Amino acid sequence: GAKMSKLQRCRKWPISLVSTLLSFLFLMSMVPVASAYSYSKSHWLNKNQVVMLMATVKGNYLTSAQQAVSNINSATKVGFSTGTRMVWQATSQNFGKNGWEGQSAYTFLASGYTKDAVSRVNTYYMKSSYPVARMRVLWLHEFSHCWGLGHSTINTVMYKSASDAYNNGVRYLTSDDIKGINSRY
């Protein structure tokens, strides 16, 4: 075969590299974007739920909880409202220095679906003087656990610490949080 000079080999190499990179980028554009959401054990049989905001939820806690309910209701396929049914309760009170700013708990029917739930904000850590937006992210986080979401990445409501998500710029449900809830219902 014909011998190529060193100069000819050097000129050919960048063309190979560019075509390989372009092929790689094209193939990567075909890969669907992965979702970061995960699931908790909670899964309601009915996608329409009512949360009862207990008397302890007042002032900025009430405003932020109502905003969280509205955000979930408008951004997802579920129907979420406030009312006086005792199936899902939300409370904000001083649970003391226990390490959590918010917590959700639920019990299950024999079928495995969620029977009832409670979402709690610990005012020991989440002070009434904090911004409503910060409280809203915490309510969104706890309500989303009850809708069936587990923890996710820091740029979502479902990051393991709602305050860290807030400090990272999260204010409302993100597209990942929305996809997670919608895929569940």
Where are these regions (language model features)?
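Zinc-dependent metalloendopeptidases
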Residues: P32-Y185
